[in-house]
Amino acid sequence: RIARNNFQLIKPKVTCVIINDNNDQLISSIKKEMKIFDETIVANIQKESFTNKINHFLNKNDIQCYQYDNKQEIQNDILQYVHCSWCVFLEVNENFDKKNKDILYNIFSLFSEAIEKENITFTFYNLKNNEYYHAHAIYSQYNHSSNINVELNI
């Protein structure tokens, strides 16, 4: 209860990794997520090149973009580029509305005692059916590491 009440005071910095397989939706998705997260990275699996408009937008906003052949490659690789405490992975076509934002903060509050540990990463999967969310937090300190899994059906 106390940790939950104080959660806003210790809100960690959060990176959003947008998994992009739809260039047409990319800029609007980034604009939406930039309001919520401290850092945005694009993991691009779209084969076609970005338009000049998208390239200009990414450069102007200092958004890093990395190219992948498939989604399976993304998670472990992208974490080396993350500068924040927690990392959230979102599909580019999903709607991250207020309801989902509240869910995300509720998940964070469950792990509030882990926030000060070292090497925290956090993944939040927003799946296509918009009903099922899987959260996975990993933290390690010294030689000890723990895995925390949360599954939410909404």
Describe these PLM feature segments.
Residues D21-Q25, K47, K71:
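Short beta->alpha connector loops
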Residues K11, V82-S85:
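Active-site acidic short loop of glycosyltransferases
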Residues I30-D69:
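Acidic donor-binding segment of Leloir-type glycosyltransferases
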Residues V14-C16, D38-V42, I63, E116-F122:
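Hydrophobic beta-strand segments of well-ordered beta-sheets in folded domains
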Residues Q8, K35, H56, Q80-Y81:
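Solvent-exposed polar/charged
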Residues I45, H83, L90-V92:
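Active-site acidic Asp-centered loop
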Residues R1-A3, Q72-L79, C87, E94-I154:
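Catalytic-site signature of metal-activated, phosphate-bearing donor transferases
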Residues R1-K32:
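N-proximal low-complexity "stem/linker" segments adjacent to membrane-targeting elements
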